[in-house]
């Protein structure tokens, strides 16, 4: 698979709590050099990141996260976070569902929350993180149905901050049950170009990772 095609599907991600501005600038530079889909960064850096890339011909999208990583903020707080992120220049928003709400069987409320957040970032891409490692197969299928019915643009496997990240089986399950042309983002544990290819094969259309760009940089430095 063409490496440029893989890179075009990558949200080049840095969400560690100790992240500094120098590190953010570094991933922006890498993302622009290698033409990734976006940089995915903490909301507190969105405005500075957008300004940093503003006059660059090879700028990429800015993605951030809300309700992250637990998802149990109130809907009102998540809506505010989304609106604030868009105001500051975010092009894409990745939200975490209220997992307890899903497990309680309150599917209509999960759907309503997604749509309220999408309304707050209308005209911009919304991805819905369902944290697959905490869900049963039945719950994953229900979330596929909810996201398919919603106004969101993508379903996403994982935050990368829970007990496990994306699996090939989960991406295949999403591909089998998603409808309405929604995208599928795999995130968490994508450690190599081979991993990326294996997630794309069953249906991933976006990849959340920082490692692929690092691997390519290391190969270039080694003369490969």
What are the language-model segments listed below?
Residues 64-68, 87-102, 149-165, 186-224:
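Glycine-rich phosphate-binding active-site loops on the catalytic face of alpha/beta enzymes
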Residues 34, 88, 120-121, 146, ...:
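Structural motif
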Residues 37-44, 48-92:
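Active-site cofactor/substrate anionic-group-binding motifs, chiefly glycine-
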């Amino acid at each position: 698979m063409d490496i440029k095609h893989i890179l075009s599907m990558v949200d080049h991600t840095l969400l560690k709590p100790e992240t500094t501005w120098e590190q953010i600038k570094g991933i922006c530079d890498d993302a622009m050099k290698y033409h990734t889909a976006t940089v995915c960064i903490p909301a507190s850096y969105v405005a500075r990141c957008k300004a940093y890339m503003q006059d660059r011909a090879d700028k990429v999208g800015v993605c951030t996260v809300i309700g992250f990583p637990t998802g149990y903020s109130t809907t009102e707080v998540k809506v505010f976070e989304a609106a604030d992120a868009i105001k500051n220049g975010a092009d894409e928003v990745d939200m975490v569902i209220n997992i307890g709400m899903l497990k309680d069987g309150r599917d209509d409320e999960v759907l309503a929350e997604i749509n309220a957040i999408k309304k707050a970032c209308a005209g911009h891409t919304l991805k819905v993180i369902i944290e697959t490692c905490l869900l049963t197969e039945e719950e994953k299928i229900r979330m596929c149905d909810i996201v398919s019915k919603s106004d969101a643009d993508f379903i996403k496997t994982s935050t990368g901050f829970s007990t496990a990240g994306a699996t090939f089986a989960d991406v295949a399950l999403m591909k089998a049950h998603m409808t309405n042309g929604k995208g599928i983002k795999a995130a968490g544990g994508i450690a190599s170009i081979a991993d990326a290819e294996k997630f794309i094969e069953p249906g991933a259309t976006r990849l959340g990772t920082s490692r692929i760009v690092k691997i390519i940089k290391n190969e270039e430095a080694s003369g490969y």
